């Protein structure tokens, strides 16, 4: 899947930016794979095998190194801050249909594998939960802050994916550290909802680009006048991603918040505040996009 993704990102080979983004994605993806291979070698040195049932019941320094390697490698492939630098370029410069595939399937499946492999390798649920909570704060804050600064629509959507990954990590980390399985289910529900909604957003953006050569966020004005159905589908996707009722994005975030209360300690209390603040910050770039879609002052004729 990774090799196909590298090629698809650079599919528009007649443009230097696509080649650059594809090459950057290839290099960083290869580094992630090499780090995970180093992890496999470390685990094999400790246990004499790579079967998960064996590694889950074994302890040792090389096994800890192996777990760390898998966390770093899969974290890079999932776009976890500060290993996310490839993601805006890959999402922003690939064809919109490829961006939808990357956001909807590739990154999400890698994040799921990170959760499963880390536990399968015997990492304590409480330890993994704390790691996910800490990095979720970074993802939410960095993703939303950088999205607010973007002028290019696809890069804005890319950085919002970084933030959405943080919401999922917060829910799963909460569930693992404090033994709240419903929080984990809420996180996976948000993961699925985001995959569908973000894919819809990228596909809608692709149709806008095809019909109107839209690249910048301000160029979305007049979309409803010229291609009203696309404006509606794009708006639905953005409303869901913003967590506005009654769509799945709101339901998932509400579920996560209800499972985080009452806060068992300061980490979760801080996480709830960061979660809410970032959800409000996200409205600062989602709502202007929705308004521009239905602002006909930019329509021709």
Please state what every model-predicted region is.
Residues 5-254, 258-283, 291-293, 297:
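Hydrophobic transmembrane alpha-helices and their helix-loop junctions in integral membrane proteins
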Residues 1-2:
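Hydrophobic alpha-helical hairpins/lids featuring a short glycine-rich hinge
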Residues 299-301:
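Short, intrinsically disordered, charge-balanced linker/junction segments flanking boundaries
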């Amino acid at each position: 899947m990774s090799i196909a993704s590298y090629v698809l990102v650079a599919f528009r080979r007649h443009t230097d930016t696509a080649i650059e983004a594809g090459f950057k994605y290839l290099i960083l993806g290869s580094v992630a794979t090499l780090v995970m291979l180093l992890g496999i070698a470390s685990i094999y040195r400790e246990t004499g095998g790579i079967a998960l049932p064996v590694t889950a019941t074994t302890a040792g320094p090389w096994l800890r190194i192996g777990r760390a390697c898998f966390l770093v490698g899969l974290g890079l492939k999932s776009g976890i801050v500060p290993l996310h630098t490839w993601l805006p370029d890959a999402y922003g410069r690939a064809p919109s249909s490829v961006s939808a595939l990357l956001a909807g399937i590739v990154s999400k499946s890698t994040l799921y594998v990170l959760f499963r492999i880390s536990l399968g390798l015997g990492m304590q649920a409480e330890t993994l939960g704390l790691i996910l909570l800490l990095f979720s704060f970074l993802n939410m804050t960095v993703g939303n802050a950088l999205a607010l600064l973007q002028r290019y629509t696809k890069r804005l959507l890319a950085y919002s994916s970084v933030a959405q990954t943080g919401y999922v990590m917060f829910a799963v980390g909460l569930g693992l550290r404090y033994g709240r399985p419903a929080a984990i289910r809420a996180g996976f529900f948000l993961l699925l909802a985001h995959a569908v909604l973000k894919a819809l957003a990228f596909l809608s953006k692709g149709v806008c680009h095809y019909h109107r050569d839209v690249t910048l966020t301000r160029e979305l004005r007049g979309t409803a006048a010229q291609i009203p159905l696309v404006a509606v589908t794009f708006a639905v996707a953005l409303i869901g991603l913003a967590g506005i009722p009654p769509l799945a994005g709101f339901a998932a975030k509400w579920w996560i918040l209800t499972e985080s209360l009452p806060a068992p300690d300061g980490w979760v209390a801080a996480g709830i505040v960061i979660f809410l603040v970032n959800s409000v910050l996200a409205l600062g770039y989602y709502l202007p996009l929705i308004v521009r879609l239905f602002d006909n002052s930019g329509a021709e004729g």
